[in-house]
Design a protein with these regions (language model features):
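Short coil/turn segments at alpha/beta junctions that flank glycine-rich nucleotide-binding fingerprints
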Residues: 88, 105-109
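Acetyl-CoA-dependent GNAT
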Residues: 2-3, 7-78, 82-84, 95, ...
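Conserved glycine-rich acetyl-CoA-binding loop
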Residues: 69, 82-96, 117-124, 128
């Protein structure tokens, strides 16, 4: 199954809003409707629909941190796979594609992500990509980061 990231547009935003999670997962992230609204008012957000062929399977949204004077840093703010398609490797492929898109910005040095500390599935998933926990933020979320070019850190 070939996974692609596509632009969010007039033709797919309604479907994205209604992508289902399992009930216990709904507390782990903001709704897709809220995320899409955010992306219309913050120019740094990049919302992407996750597809296999023509079937919508999920949603991911990341942004450059230019607005916080961290132009070389990106943050993944939303990431979800329709619960009917979880456990099939789709999320792994989609996150890899998002990381590759971010790497295309030659200035990008790091990617951050946050998740609830009580979500061990997220912790293990992101760690498998090389994300390292950096601590809990003021909202009680665990932050993790991956350095894209370790040579820039020296």
């Amino acid at each position: 199954m070939k996974i692609q990231l596509k632009e969010v547009d007039i033709h797919n935003f309604g479907e994205i809003i209604h992508l289902p999670l399992l009930p216990h997962q709904e507390n782990y992230l903001a709704s897709n409707a809220y995320s899409l609204a955010q992306s219309k008012y913050d120019i740094y957000y990049k919302p992407r629909a996750i597809y296999a062929d023509e079937q919508l399977l999920g949603f991911i949204m990341y942004k450059t941190m230019d607005d916080e004077n961290r132009p070389r840093e990106y943050a993944i703010h939303r990431f979800m796979i329709d619960h009917r398609h979880q456990g099939k490797g789709i999320g792994r492929q989609a996150l890899q594609l998002a990381i590759e898109e971010i790497r295309q910005d030659m200035q990008a040095e790091r990617i951050t992500i946050c998740y609830l500390p009580e979500n061990p599935v997220a912790k293990d998933f992101y760690a498998s990509f090389g994300f390292v926990e950096t601590g809990i933020d003021e909202e009680g979320e665990m932050n993790a980061e991956i350095v894209l070019n370790a040579a820039l850190e020296k």
